[in-house]
Amino acid sequence: MIVLNDRIIPWQPTVIAGPKQAMLVTPETATMMIKKARRPLMVVGPLAKRQEVLEHTVKIIRHFDLPVVATADTYRALSEAGIESEPHGIVEITNLLKDPSWEGIRGEGQHDLVIFIGCIYYIASQGLSSLKHFAPHIKTLTICKTFHSNADASFPNMDDDEWFRYLEKMYAE
């Protein structure tokens, strides 16, 4: 009998990553990846509007001074929390990130690490797959509560309590 680790299988079982699957990361590893990046970018999706998630997201953004892309309808929630962001659709930002000549959100050059939180799983999976195959100049990190096999690195599948502890460890140094 084969036993699968339910923490590292895609949250949506039909998402098949192929031979290259995400590395499972801890909050400490995620933090190290962000610190090591020269031009990281945070992409915040609509699932991050939930109050508890938004509070952690804002603290992470401030802690690392991350430029932010607000997808879907998160722009207002981030603005009300005092976070400056650029509104882009998830498909639009994915296409911009694939272009090595794009100068990035702050005009300082292409981003080398993109951190995703709160994006709807099925659309994030497609964007991550596109970046994996067509943007080798970018690393991707998902700090969602679901494992994203198409990212370069991802948190495991977990419940909210564990996820909030993971997120808190990222800014509570």
Curated annotation (Swiss-Prot):
Pathway annotation from the record: One-carbon metabolism; methanogenesis from acetate
SUPFAM superfamilies membership: DHS-like NAD/FAD-binding domain
Signal peptide positions (record): none
Highest rank taxon of the organism: Archaea
Database matches in InterPro entries: CdhB, DHS-like_NAD/FAD-binding_dom
A Pfam family that the UniProt record links to this protein: CO_dh
Single GO BP term: methanogenesis, from acetate
Its job: Part of a complex that catalyzes the reversible cleavage of acetyl-CoA, allowing growth on acetate as sole source of carbon and energy. The alpha-epsilon subcomponent functions as a carbon monoxide dehydrogenase. The precise role of the epsilon subunit is unclear; it may have a stabilizing role within the alpha(2)epsilon(2) component and/or be involved in electron transfer to FAD during a potential FAD-mediated CO oxidation.
Similarity comment: family membership: Belongs to the CdhB family.
Quaternary state and interactors: Heterotetramer of two alpha and two epsilon subunits. The ACDS complex is made up of alpha, epsilon, beta, gamma and delta subunits with a probable stoichiometry of (alpha(2)epsilon(2))(4)-beta(8)-(gamma(1)delta(1))(8).
Protein name (database record): Acetyl-CoA decarbonylase/synthase complex subunit epsilon
Natural source organism: Methanothermobacter thermautotrophicus (strain ATCC 29096 / DSM 1053 / JCM 10044 / NBRC 100330 / Delta H) (Methanobacterium thermoautotrophicum)
